[in-house]
Amino acid sequence: CELSGKVGTFRVKFTLPEDNDSITVRNIIINRDIPFRFSLLRMGVFLALILLGYGIVHSTLLRRPCHQEKLFVRASAAVVTAVCCLGCVSLVWADTNRPIQEIFERESGNQITRELVDAFEAGQVSLETPVDPGLLAMENPYDWSARSADNVNAQWDHVFYNGRYYSYYGIAPVVTLFLPYHLLTGHYFPTQFAVLLYGLIGVVFLTLTYLAYLRRFQRTLPCGMALGGLIVMQASSGIWYVVARTLFYEISIASGFACVAVGAYFLMTSNILSRGRISCPKLGLASFFLALAVLCRPTLAVYCIAAVVMILLALPRAGKHPGVQLAAGKQNAKRIAYLAWGAVPMLLLAGVQLWYNYARFDSPLDFGIQYSLTINDFTRSQFHMGFVFIGLYNYLLAVPKFTWTFPFFFTEFTTLHINGYY
């Protein structure tokens, strides 16, 4: 504990699980000296940021426009990206406590790395995990309190529908990584390295998207500002939380991040948002990867919606060719081809998702989240507008808390009674 001011006496109370339990106090230390800890890495990061800030203000090179120092901007971006990738590898490696060969020869896995793989290999969408008869007999199997009271064995965070287990989580990482790996090797791909792989792809393409944005919209931005913007963008990315805790939940997040980053890069370089000739093949790749992100994590459909709006806004330009006057028929043909490149990949993958939903839950629009076996009974969840304003406040307006310990400030933590917090 940390005490301040005048402290005369204090009492320590231990609460044990059972009445006959005991605890042994071996020693009590008061006023122990706080150890002096010096982190070279932390000081190095602070020093680099200070030097960067000084250089932005005073350096002639860093004040030059990006388009005049293309090589410097690319080299600096490569260094920043390499450092970020090294940081991701370090975080994953620090949590790795077994030989690499043993890790990549796993005979077991989790809901995504093993259960979905086994189900797909068996030609079914339901999981092969056996269901406890007690769960089948329950009036409301989604009531966590009732399951606990009846001592019913239920697979945590699995979807339970019509007497079978399913998985809510996206199938894209299963189809693109885990299933092929198991078919080729007979082993299950490790979760932590799957998260790392997708995280590295996302980090690299996030930088490439940023550079493509600079070339098209911020050519006169000073080099120092451009470099600082890249650092802020990579540092504020949520991928750091993902690679620091590589559970199966993070597979969907990391793979979705990678697909969105790749899709954003091709969307930016297709020139539908900027001047120049529109590249339909790149638009097709953007459509494919953004749709694939939805098959990683359904909530990422918001990026597809945004992409559709951008594609439609660029439709008038799609029928034109720079410096060439085309006939009306050719313009319409080019617009139709443009729409096909943008729509077909997205519609095909949307069809896969809709079929997968119907095969599991008898409705193409039902993703199954309400059938999850977790703490909350999602089948009886309600929407309250007041929670929207609470979320807006906590994410946009809440003032951070400051402390005397590193990193010296934290986000506000708001508790919403049972099982809810920001």
Regions found by a protein language model. Give the residues of each.
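Membrane-interface alpha helices of multi-pass inner-membrane proteins
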Residues: 261, 282-297, 304, 345-353
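Interfacial juxtamembrane loops and adjacent helix segments
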Residues: 122-169, 210, 233-244, 374-378, ...
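Perimembrane helix-loop-helix junctions
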Residues: 303-347
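Membrane-lumen/periplasm interface segments of specific transmembrane helices
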Residues: 90-93, 97, 317, 337-422
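Transmembrane-helix signature of polytopic, membrane-embedded enzymes
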Residues: 206-238, 258, 275-282, 323
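Transmembrane-helix motifs of polytopic, lipid-linked glycan transferases
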Residues: 190-219, 262-266
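Specific aromatic-rich, kink-prone transmembrane helix
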Residues: 255-275, 284, 288-290, 304-307
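Start-transfer (signal-anchor) and selected internal transmembrane alpha helices
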Residues: 41-111, 224-226, 330-345
